[in-house]
Amino acid sequence: MNLPQEFEQHTRTLMGDELYQILQKGLEDTPPTSIRLNPLKTSGYNVSVPLADGQVPWCEQGVYLQERPNFTFDPLLHSGAYYVQEAGSMFLDLVMRQYIHRPVTMLDLCAAPGGKSTVARAALPAGSVLFSNEPMHVRANVLAENIQKFGHPDCIVTNNYPRDYRKVGISFDVVLADVPCSGEGMFRKDEGAIGEWSLQNVDKCQTLQLDIIRDIWPCLKPGGLLIYSTCTFNSREDEENVNAIIAELEAEILPVAINDDWNITGSLVDDRPMYRFIPGKTRSEGLFMAVLRKPVEADEANKKQQKAPKKNDTVKGIEHWLQGDFAFVENKGQVRAIPTAWYGLYSLAVKALKVIHAGVTIGTQKGRDIIPDQSLALNIALCQDAFPRVEIDESTALSYLRKEAIMLPSDTPRGFVLLTYQYFPLGFVKNIGNRANNLYPQEWRIKSSHIPEENTHAIYLHDD
């Protein structure tokens, strides 16, 4: 790997010769492949991982793989049964389980593509609400897709800049800021990041990162947690920024209990508790994380919450599709189900933010029908008996995921039918007798026409 000379000089000075040589060798190695199981969907199964190469030690659901299978052609990936994620990013699971033990309102500020958001949602106590935000429109749509595949109803996805949150009137117990960075930790995966690197870019990122934290700081409750992370190695974006947050905003830095044999590196400039993942030393890509607490001042509460709207006739015909207590909101023909416990938060958010997903998208009104949405198919709140189900094999599942026409058994009821693979919901079709209309979202479809002759999947499921 041909690293920029300035990067070598700067990083060697920071790390010292021995640690830098470990990093340099690690960057030449093949990146480890890891997945994280979705406990919302796999907890009732015995899960076998044929390519397993050990557990990710800081995350119970994380598993290393011996090699990288072709994930695209595994229907269980599309069902949300697991997520392909770099192992270091799963460290968030440990942080949250050590510090969050009651229901909270959390914001993942720079959330796309959604890996850390789904880690957070799995670790959050029941009754918590997760806001996942991404400023870039295209990336926000990817984030919304992954949140919907994960399948938890207590999530909102927004497409806003951090400063926009200051006008909402919502205070957060936890803010995760995985801030945009110079990307040194991605050198091994993305050679384009090497070409874009410069010390000038590092300085720009450092300034932007602190601006982001200053923008969102008023939205963090007194006593609330800020989890600051980057995917870079340099101290300017890491230790120096954390120390600036401590000095300027009077934050308290908090330790995370870790094991020595995980080979996580601490701060490279002082003895404050910070956590750095270095390829070659830790089995991961580059990651830096620190946990800070906002000083406790006078209590700040979210504004008075709005009452849920009354149910109209359309809603009364579909509320049996979900288990739980929901408020139903109709907008331009689209029906959303918002858990009533946090409908007030939703009502504040939708007035001031660009909300692109919230709760469960039930479907779209078309004539007398509500065409059920993919969000509904994949959500754990969907009632087992809400729709007729048809179990399909792998070949048919891949055809469905390509949005191709598929054949159903002759005794399949007419109307909307939920297709399942290994009993995991994949999505809806509308059976009209002589054919079934494929309702899989066009933008989610598998675009490759390749059909693998043999593909070892990441996981297999067996009933308990």
Predicted regions and their residues:
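Conserved AdoMet
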Residues: 31-90
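Conserved class I S-adenosyl-L-methionine
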Residues: 102-112
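Mobile active-site "lid"/loop adjacent to the S-adenosyl-L-methionine
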Residues: 138, 173-214, 231-238
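Class I S-adenosyl-L-methionine
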Residues: 172, 225-228, 232-344
